[in-house]
């Protein structure tokens, strides 16, 4: 309830100590004109109440904050293509925008012991940190050499793919400066590493090198690519770098199957080869990632392209999707046989995602300018 105090000189029930006749009786000067003036004051003040309430983030007459907007369950972000998708949906959970302020959010990686996500804001040349406990986003590192993909190895050390320096680096415990793990192949500089994963058997590192960080100043650098766009394996024991495939136009996001028998790589070919379609390519993994065999098309996207990808414990592939427009942008989910199970529709194009939380049942999604979370009934595979 809005309470407004009537001015003393206009209140007929209160004495005015400044007046000699202040005995509780109506003041002699309180005439009809004065009462009309008081009514006008009250009306104006009451009219201002809704605006004042909104300015304070409250719904007039309700008493709760105006944002985020309430969502009626079940959320309409779930889109089913195959009934098998329903087992991964939760009806009473919203898509939450946790933070906004990036230009192109990328490279999300979950740190379990620290309960945080590191992600890149490439054009702003910074790495950000989302704290699961507080829900707050803070600056982790700036400058960050226009880093893109990030992950944590099996010792908990952060690996980052740097665009402007065209190298793969690792942040060791003694920090703060990163150790360079790879920056050239056969005497030529790498194009610009993009995304990275780590095999648990021997800590072997697999990363993609499409060169996006060398195409525009906006995301790092401008220079001619001297190497074919490729996927590499790095042996951390001896530093040997091996090209394991160049049979892909623009290798981007990548992920192992939960048993490490398959490597999935997103091909964002249409960005520089408009006659080609965006795809996810699959290979069988040999020798802990040192060799790839049995190349095959796993999924083909008619519009837009898949970028960062993850797998769950059932072997499904969850693919961040952008540049497809409404009805396409968001997350696409594929069964191990390549059947599209469903989608999570998003208000922005999405470049990356990660399963986070103690149970790895919550999606952290990098939209273009914002980051989001969504609880699922799936559980992310325990892969980097």
Model-derived segments and their meaning:
Residues 27-36, 50-51:
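Twin-arginine (Tat) signal peptide motif
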Residues 12, 17, 22-24, 32, ...:
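Short linear motifs in intrinsically disordered/low-complexity regions
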Residues 39, 56-384:
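Sequence-structural signature of mature extracellular/luminal beta-sheet repeat domains
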Residues 2, 18, 31-32, 128, ...:
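Short, intrinsically disordered low-complexity segments
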Residues 1-30, 41, 46, 56:
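N-terminal secretory signal peptides
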Residues 3-5, 36, 324:
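Compositionally biased, low-structure terminal segments
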């Amino acid at each position: 309830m809005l309470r407004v105090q009537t001015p003393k000189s206009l209140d007929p029930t209160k004495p005015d100590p400044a007046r000699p006749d202040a005995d509780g009786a109506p003041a002699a000067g309180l005439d009809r004109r004065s009462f009309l003036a008081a009514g006008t004051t009250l009306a104006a003040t009451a009219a201002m109440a809704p605006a004042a309430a909104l300015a304070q983030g409250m719904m007039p007459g309700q008493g709760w904050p105006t944002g985020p907007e309430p969502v009626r369950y079940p959320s309409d972000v779930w889109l089913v293509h195959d009934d098998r998708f329903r087992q991964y949906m939760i009806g009473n959970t919203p898509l939450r925008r946790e933070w906004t302020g990036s230009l192109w959010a990328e490279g999300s990686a979950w740190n379990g012991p620290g309960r945080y996500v590191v992600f890149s804001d490439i054009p702003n040349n910074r790495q950000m940190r989302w704290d699961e406990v507080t829900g707050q986003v803070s600056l982790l590192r700036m400058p960050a050499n226009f880093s893109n993909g990030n992950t944590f190895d099996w010792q908990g050390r952060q690996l980052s793919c740097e665009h402007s320096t065209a190298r793969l680096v690792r942040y060791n415990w003694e920090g703060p400066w990163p150790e360079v793990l790879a920056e050239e192949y056969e005497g030529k500089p790498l194009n610009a590493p993009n995304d990275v994963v780590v095999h648990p058997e021997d800590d072997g590192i697999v990363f993609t090198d499409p060169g996006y960080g060398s195409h525009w100043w906006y995301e790092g650098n401008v220079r001619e690519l001297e190497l074919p766009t490729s996927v590499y394996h790095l042996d951390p024991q001896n530093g040997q770098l091996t090209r394991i495939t160049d049979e892909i136009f623009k290798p981007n996001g990548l992920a192992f199957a939960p048993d490490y028998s398959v490597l999935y790589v997103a091909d964002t070919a249409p960005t520089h080869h408009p006659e080609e379609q965006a795809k996810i390519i699959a290979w069988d993994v040999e020798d802990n990632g040192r060799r790839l065999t049995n190349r095959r098309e796993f999924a083909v996207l008619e519009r837009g392209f898949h970028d960062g990808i993850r797998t769950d414990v059932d072997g499904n592939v969850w693919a961040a999707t952008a540049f497809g427009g409404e009805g396409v942008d968001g997350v696409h989910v594929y069964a191990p046989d390549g059947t599209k199970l469903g989608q999570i529709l998003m208000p922005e194009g999405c470049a990356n995602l990660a399963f986070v939380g103690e149970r790895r049942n919550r999606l952290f999604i990098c939209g273009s300018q914002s980051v989001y979370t969504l609880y699922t009934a799936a559980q992310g595979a325990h892969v980097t």
